[in-house]
């Protein structure tokens, strides 16, 4: 036992490391605990062995604590061009950082997670229905789907599947030359879902189906007819494609019983070849809107343009003049937001005051209604209450409300 104890003591004493004494050479390179006083005369030598970081360098070169408390060295407010300038940030690990565009605070929206959102999503999945809200990654989905009850919610049903035959540079909907065949039960299922929700106003849209002889126009029309059979008082807006310029098919949809015929020109004429699929042209879209109005003059016709793609003021003026020339009633303006890195980049973030300016200009040109704001989309609910009111007054024969009575904040919500 004594021998074992002696061996243990020998091993213990040989493994001990002497603690450096203050003033010795070894003490200068000794790394102490976090409580070691860094203000000693040897502090400069001890920091020399520590790894400096970029963050530390930036912090040391930045404003002092006094500047932070006082609000900074320059308290002058930013002008709008500075406040809403296109900003970027480097994201990712060192050596592989990528420059990404940062959204202004007024373009950020909450992640959808309300009970009504989940309930509405479950209903759609149960009936095998798709919405453009999800497929196009609309930023307003939490607002439109998150109402307190289903009657207050707005969902834009996307017909004819979730795969488009075209590939516009701004759109995140899936594309294929040969998408799946149409679901013959979709018109009935769509009508059932809409009648179940008890909505007063519904928006239907679709992918482009250039693989079909009629572009899917008869499928679209059948859906509208079945909705009107199940819910005669519901107001139906249809946001359609251009049917490859086949105006006869435009008439089929326009005479199916819908109340609002919408077709988006998306951007100004000069940018159309760079933004939309090569099979879509600005003039073809104008002919679609004109044909819908001629097929049923009582229809409200509607279109939408994205801003922030690099358009000029004169190009926007020209687009609005051409739209009024074919008697388009409603126009909406919204900010283009890049859905993924594969899509075309944002040229600029347009300020809210510019959206308001174009709203007023559109109304002054004679448009019945204009919804204009960074988060406004063609089927956003901001305009539906007004359009619904106009349609009901037309049915009853009452005079329509002048567009000058529309509150400014309603169009930019």
Curated annotation (Swiss-Prot):
Q: Which cofactor does it need?
A: [4Fe-4S] cluster
Annotated GO biological process: lipoate biosynthetic process
Q: Residue limits of the Radical SAM core domain?
A: 147-368
What name does UniProt use for this protein?
A: Lipoyl synthase, mitochondrial
How is the cofactor bound here?
Binds 2 [4Fe-4S] clusters per subunit. One cluster is coordinated with 3 cysteines and an exchangeable S-adenosyl-L-methionine.
Q: A Gene Ontology MF term for this entry? A: 4 iron, 4 sulfur cluster binding
Coiled-coil stretches are none
InterPro entries, A to Z: Aldolase_TIM (IPR013785), Elp3/MiaA/NifB-like_rSAM (IPR006638), LIAS_N (IPR031691), Lipoyl_synth (IPR003698), rSAM (IPR007197)
**PROSITE patterns on file:** RADICAL_SAM
Q: Where is the transit peptide?
A: 1-33
Q: Provide the binding site for [4Fe-4S] cluster 2.
A: 164, 168, 171
Which top EC class is given?
A: transferase
Q: Where in the cell is it found?
A: Mitochondrion
Q: Which UniProt keywords apply?
A: 4Fe-4S, Iron, Iron-sulfur, Metal-binding, Mitochondrion, S-adenosyl-L-methionine, Transferase, Transit peptide
Pathway per the UniProt entry: Protein modification; protein lipoylation via endogenous pathway; protein N(6)-(lipoyl)lysine from octanoyl-[acyl-carrier-protein]: step 2/2
Please name the source species: Emericella nidulans (strain FGSC A4 / ATCC 38163 / CBS 112.46 / NRRL 194 / M139) (Aspergillus nidulans)
Q: Which Gene3D superfamilies match?
A: Aldolase class I
